[in-house]
Design a protein with these regions (language model features):
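Charged docking surfaces used in two-component/phosphorelay signaling
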Residues: 14-22
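Short hydrophobic/Thr-rich beta-strand motif most characteristic of the beta2 strand and flanking loop
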Residues: 24-31, 39, 101
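Active-site beta3 strand of CheY-like receiver
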Residues: 43-49
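Receiver (REC) domain active-site loop signature in two-component systems and cognate sites
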Residues: 54
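C-terminal output helix
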Residues: 105-114
């Protein structure tokens, strides 16, 4: 399974990449929305984790662009955020996210979400 992790935090990217690699995933990382959009067409991930708070192109905008592309509209997107408010979760749903994972998350929480989308 190919999973993309989009986060401006190197620590989050590396942590998620390590956990998912150990679970048999091919992981593609991106530092922001622009980086992600340039890699999505080539890598065609099966699942995308996107941080909300990023410079240049935030997670909401990135998710909306992914979901509005017919080729990737069916690709599950999980939003990552340190914000746990109803407004933030609702905004994620409006732009098309499938799920919301609040940081800091545990390895078990990450794997629980991952397993829901595993092919």
């Amino acid at each position: 399974m190919k999973v993309m992790v989009v986060d401006d935090s190197n620590t989050i990217r590396k942590t998620v990449e390590t956990i998912l690699n150990k679970n048999g995933c091919e992981v593609i990382t991106a530092v922001d929305g622009y980086d992600a959009l340039s890699k999505i067409a080539d890598s065609k991930p099966d699942l995308i984790f996107i941080d909300i708070m990023m410079p240049r192109l935030d997670g909401y905008q990135t998710c909306a662009l992914v979901k509005n592309n017919p080729e990737f509209s069916g690709t599950p997107v999980v939003m990552l955020s340190s914000k746990d408010g109803l407004f933030d979760k609702a905004k994620g749903r409006i732009v098309g996210s499938d799920q919301y994972l609040t940081k800091p998350f545990s390895k078990d929480e990450l794997l629980e979400v991952f397993e829901q989308y595993r092919a």
